[in-house]
Design a protein with these regions (language model features):
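Carboxylate-rich, polar loop motifs that coordinate divalent cations or form catalytic acidic clusters
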Residues: 1-279
């Protein structure tokens, strides 16, 4: 564990912008966006898009920051093109630079020209709710409850790709295992491997228990899993434990890991009250 970046109290949120100072690896350029700019303290997710805008998902709406001003997007009962709900789970940008916002009441796709949103529906005309996403070569996958949806670039459609009966398995994180299998993580029921063709599901070759806060596969095809209050573990595809980090054996600042992201070969680890650790 190389570096720890402490987070400030919840009165403001810190966003790491693109510029990295060349002097020392642990020096980053930070910009504070405070409550004065209209940003709530309960930030849940962040995305920096291809154009350089920073999208911020909170429990009370969506923010778009251009480096100077923060624009807010919220559900408006009298506006059919506003967000379906203010609770934001995830924000994603696909390879066609569509911005997807995953909310409590359904997926929204941002329309840049009109500065509002459209909402894909299922075969019954109902909004599609998803909690996670995964980019694939020909589109983007979304993880719902016992369901995996796919947006295809070829025909710009969003359809149900696979249903699997796993007792209300809410997919909070997912990544490709191989060309036909997804690794799916649920907060309370652990991890499954799901066959995209048949819907069959099985446990992976490693067991981290039923309570998993987050999971990711890095650029070296290593699987990082954060059991609740259990630090962070790294596995190979054959189930071999490659590394295990906790407050007892490393500089990890908190054993509850809430988020993981990879940047330039380094793993950014967001913890519960212990700031950001960089591995």
């Amino acid at each position: 564990m190389k570096t720890k970046c402490a987070v400030l109290p919840s009165l403001f949120f810190i966003i790491q912008l693109v510029g990295v100072l060349p002097l020392r690896a642990e020096h980053y350029y930070f910009k504070q966006i405070s409550l004065k700019e209209g940003l709530p303290s309960n930030v849940r997710c962040i995305l920096r898009d291809e154009q350089g805008f920073v999208w911020i998902g909170t429990k009370s709406g969506l923010g778009k920051f251009d480096g100077h001003e923060l624009k807010r997007y919220k559900h408006q009962a009298n506006d059919p093109n506003s967000l379906l709900h203010n609770l934001i789970y995830q924000i994603a940008e696909d390879k066609q630079h569509n911005i997807w916002v995953l909310t409590e009441k359904g997926i929204a796709r941002y329309q840049q020209q009109s500065n509002d949103f459209t909402f894909p529906t299922d075969e019954d005309g109902k909004n599609i709710t998803a909690y996670s996403f995964c980019l694939v070569p020909d589109g983007i996958l979304f993880g719902g409850k016992d369901r995996i949806y796919k947006y295809s670039y070829n025909d710009s459609s969003l359809r149900l790709l696979q249903y699997f009966n796993a007792n209300s398995f809410k997919i909070n994180a997912l990544s490709m295992w191989d060309s036909k299998t997804l690794l799916c993580c649920s907060r309370w029921t652990g991890i499954y491997l799901v066959d995209l063709h048949t819907g069959e599901h099985r446990r992976p070759p490693f067991d981290c228990g039923p309570e998993i806060t987050t999971m990711m596969t890095d650029s070296r095809k290593r699987i990082w899993i954060a059991p609740y209050s259990g630090g962070l573990r790294c596995y190979s595809y054959d189930g071999k434990l490659l590394a295990s980090y906790s407050t007892r054996n490393s500089a990890l600042s908190n054993d509850i890991v809430l988020s993981l992201a990879e940047r330039e070969g380094q793993l950014w680890i967001g913890t519960d009250g212990g700031g950001i650790n960089i591995l």
